[in-house]
Structures are given as C-alpha cells and as structure tokens.
C-alpha cells in the first residue's frame, strides 16, 4: 500500500469516527467534545436573537448551521420563537430533516428548507428563513428583487422566486409550507447557485458559508427591498450592474464583523 493511499484511508477512517461520535452524542456532549461545535451552537443562539431584534424574523422564522464536526448534519432550534432560543433548545438533524440522538421534542415544520439547501449546496453552512413583509410584494407581483446599493450586492442579477404551485403534490393547492424533503429540494433547486430566494406568498430563504454572513445577507436584503420599493415609486431605478455587484460583494463582505459586533451588543444589553 502506498503512503498516499494509507494517508487517505486514515483520513477517511478519522472522518467516519468523528461522524459516529457526533451522531451518537447529544448536542451538549458534542459541545463539550468539540470547541468548534460549542462556538457554532452559541453563535446560532445569538443569531436567533439578532434576527429578531433586526426584524428579519418575528415569532416565526429560524436559522440553522451545519455541524462543523459532521457536514452531514445540522443544528436548528426546536419549534419556539427565535427571540427566546437558548443553547438547550438546539436540536441536531440529518440531511433528510430527521431529528437525531433520540430527540423527541417538536421540531420546526419547515426544517426541510434547511436540509434541502444544506444537502445540495456544500458551500453553504448556514440558512435563514423568515417572512419579512418588505420582501413579500416582490414575490406577489413578479418584480425582481435586485441590488440597489452595495450592502445588498450579493443579490447579483436578482433573487429567484420559488413558486410552490409548480412542485406541490398531489394538487397545486398547498398550505404554502415547505413541509417535506421534496419541497426542500425544489426550493434548493430554485435557489440554484445564488444565496437568496423569495417564496411567493410566504417569505424568503438566505444562505451563506457562515452564520454571521447569512444574518448580514438577511438583514440587508430586507433593507434593499424597502429602498427598491420606494425608488420604484419615484422613477426608473438604477440597479447595480453585474460587475458592480460582484466587486461590491467582495469588498463589503470582508467587513461583516463590524455590524455583527453592533447587533451582538444590542441584543446583549439588558
């Protein structure tokens, strides 16, 4: 056996060992064993509070993060309001949306939004879903949400629109919820290689490679919607060109630690 083959086998064995440990351990046990898991879960809790404070979610809405010690599972709160989520509320799921570790608490019904995107987009590690009212008119009218300023440059050439009627079974008259793996996959397919998708008559989903970045994108997509709506009342809107959007995204997303610091301090104040 060559040295390279031996190293590959050893690495694969280590990955399997980590995955086995993670699937057998509770979230708290994983936090005790893996510093990266502890950091991810604690940041996930903080993100729930920030999203609520910034009106990206309300009593409904949720955020997930991929397990840094096992990319085939993710963490998401049990079914409670984002503003009250604590570490002990975090559950672990596989990429089919099944709760792990024998956890029988009630999960979010739309956890398949997260499983669908995280399974199909290995570059995305965190997903947000919410129902911000500023975004809804775009999905209702077919008006494309496009970047109007540098903070929302990640919208690129415009956010795609998920039309659940095209995928709901057995009839197109669904309850509008992404409540099963097939609909989660359909939503992920609509998202494609982008980072933000609108859901007609429902809300939005955002993705990023980190919790901080997906929170940033959620908040500034909502702000973009408000600005774009106002600008459209005044006349022809000058959107960012594809080149401007690409350049602005690269620049602004190097600085997301700054608003994260602000938002964190705001939710930590008594």
PLM regions: where:
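Glycine-rich flexible loops
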Residues: 24-270
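Bacterial N-terminal signal peptides
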Residues: 9-20
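Hydrophobic alpha-helical segments with strong N-terminal bias
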Residues: 7-10, 115
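N-terminal secretory signal peptides that target proteins for export/translocation
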Residues: 1-7
């Amino acid at each position: 056996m060559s040295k390279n083959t031996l190293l590959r086998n050893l690495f694969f064995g280590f990955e399997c060992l980590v995955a086995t440990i993670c699937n057998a351990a509770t979230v708290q046990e994983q936090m005790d064993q893996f510093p990266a898991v502890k950091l991810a879960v604690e940041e996930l809790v903080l993100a729930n509070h920030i999203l609520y404070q910034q009106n990206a979610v309300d009593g409904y809405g949720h955020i997930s993060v991929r397990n840094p010690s096992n990319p085939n599972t993710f963490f998401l709160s049990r079914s409670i309001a984002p503003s009250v989520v604590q570490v002990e509320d975090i559950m672990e799921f596989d990429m089919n949306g099944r709760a792990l570790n024998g956890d029988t608490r009630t999960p979010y019904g739309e956890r398949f939004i997260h499983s669908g995107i995280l399974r199909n987009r290995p570059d995305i590690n965190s997903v947000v879903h919410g129902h911000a009212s500023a975004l809804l008119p775009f999905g209702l009218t077919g008006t494309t949400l496009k970047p109007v300023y540098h903070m929302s440059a990640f919208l690129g050439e415009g956010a795609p629109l998920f039309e659940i009627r095209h995928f709901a079974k057995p009839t197109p008259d669904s309850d509008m919820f992404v409540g099963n793996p097939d609909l989660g996959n359909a939503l992920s397919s609509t998202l494609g290689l982008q980072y933000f998708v609108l859901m007609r008559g429902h809300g939005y989903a955002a993705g990023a490679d980190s919790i901080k970045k997906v929170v940033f994108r959620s908040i500034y997509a909502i702000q973009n919607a408000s600005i774009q709506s106002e600008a459209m009342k005044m006349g022809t809107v000058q959107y960012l060109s594809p080149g401007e959007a690409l350049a602005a995204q690269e620049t602004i997303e190097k600085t997301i630690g700054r608003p994260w610091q602000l938002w964190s301090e705001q939710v930590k104040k008594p």
